[in-house]
Amino acid sequence: MGVENIIILSNRISKRSADEASPASLEAYPALITAGGIGTRLLPFSKEIPKEMLPIIAHDGDDSLQLKPLVQAIFEQLYGAGVRNFYFVVGRGKRAIEDHFSPDSGFLEFLEKKAKRPASLSDLYAKIRSSNLVFLNQTEPLGFGDAVLRGRTVIKGPFLVQAADTFILSK
């Protein structure tokens, strides 16, 4: 598989035709979300919290605004385009990303008892449960290219590439 089989969303680069890269056909591709960097430009914030978990204000499904981690907004946007197979490349100190995408039924039950169950969290968990999520470990921060190559070793065929620290606003 050569570079022509990789669609890079974060830079809107595509080696495929415009029709193949349209949102209507994205469901055919798995998505590789790179989150292995150490976030030196965001220190001291990124020392303890992964930059991909930075809170942003994003539209929810009902067009209301909601505070959510950047990587969640990216996941939901790809999910909305039909993607159901996700590969996350994570590095040291990125356990918060894996935890965030691991549904916690006990936490939802706790919130229900307090009558504070946010529908958006239930919606996120439903999306996660209807998707395939795989976490790949980048043992040392060797850059974006290394993260893409790690994905290439396990993903068969063409795949989408999205950096977890770059958000593209959809229409």
PLM features: what roles do these ranges have?
Residues 3-4, 8-112:
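N-terminal glycine-rich phosphate-binding loop and ensuing alpha1 helix
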